[in-house]
Amino acid sequence: MMSSKSSHRLAGRLVVGCLASLAAVVALAAAQWSMQPKESKLTFVGEQAGAQFEGGFDKFTADIAFDPKDLAASRFDVKIDTASVNTQDGERDDAIKSADLFDVKRFPTARYVADRFTDKGSNKYSATGKLTLRNVTKDVPIDFTFENKGGEAWLKGTAKIKRLDFGVGQGDWKDTSQVGNDVQVRFALRLKGTS
């Protein structure tokens, strides 16, 4: 049978353990940010027939946990509705959504998850994350700035991807003389602290 002193010691350890776990959860919650969809943008620049064109996505979500003082606990998780692509050209949008490019019926969601961050100084950061597009996952680095003013912040940055690395371009669309392989991605996320 456990003695009274042993019982008290065990209870004390359990309480300390619970408090430590609670403190860890609170610390993580302090770095959580809520994206404001109406003020946030996710855009890209591509090239078709030698001319640049711009586009974006009307629907995407971003779960952001970011603290410049605790990069190890930071994480980005962005989910993109591929069918919401919008280049202000209906014919081009239909082509991008087709089976040879995004194939939105089979792959309705693209996802980017980053959990490795580097402080480059002067409010500039880089991250290495994994982009999944058309069921292909590859590392994609991003460069960004983070400006926090009283619990409201802007997260702005860029990335560069090669569309053919993700199978975006089947058949004639593999021809990079017609549609460039390099795509510049830009994002500007308006964030509000959730705690």
Describe the function of each predicted region.
Residues 1-2, 156:
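C-terminal intrinsically disordered extensions
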Residues 3-18:
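Bacterial N-terminal signal peptides that target proteins for export
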Residues 24-26:
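N-terminal signal peptide c-region/cleavage motif recognized by signal peptidases
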Residues 29-195:
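Low-complexity, acidic/polar, glycine-enriched regions of mature
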